[in-house]
Amino acid sequence: MSKKFYYDEDNFKLLHGDTILLLKKIEPQSIDMIFADPPYFLSGDGITCSGGKMVSVNKGKWDEKRSIKEKHNFNKRWIRACKNVLNDNGTIWISGTMHNIYSIGMVLEEEGFKILNNITWKKLNPPPNISCRTFVHSTETILWAKKDISKAKHKFNYDVMKKLNNNKQMKDVWETSLTKPSEKKCGKHPTQKPIELLERIILASTDENDLILDPFNGSGTTGIVANKLNRKYIGIEKEKEYLDLTIRRKESEGNV
């Protein structure tokens, strides 16, 4: 691709800019797996509990509230661009909540994907519901999909997953803790995913030397885990502060 990388070391590449524009510069069908944690468009004037403290839910301009139509159009554009760079045997994982996951599921089917699994990520230590007017939000949904074409033979490392699960078939409800403080020692991102979660996703659907893409790099957890497991990585991120955070994590002792 002609675009100069913001960072390029040890099969770990970062691009700075609009993900939809930059996806068009990546070679078609060159990616083996995509993990995406797109904006939920939740930021407003609310508050939540984090680390025992009351904090604002305003994450930044990139997460400002949008209309239903705007959110759906955005999801359609980036998922369509991802399909173009994903090889025919590759798969895509997309994390979301009730605020965006229904749009994402619909777009996946509209754009010619077949959903393989609807993973429920159950958080073992979710923040409390301070309003006391709804149930505690303790789960997120991760959709796993492949291209809906007859020749597509997606990769699923069944035996690896079974071994991780005490030699039993792994179910579609995954229990892990939230991101550990040790994973935030270089700085933090407001929607940072835990290393344990990405390890399972990457081990399930890729082999060593496969090329993984995260179109919403954030703090770089996908890339950190990809390198740890001897996979190649490309991350795209609009905010320079999070690219710099990713680089600090990559270059820190222990790669956390």
PLM feature spans:
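Core catalytic lobe of class I
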Residues: M1-L245, N255
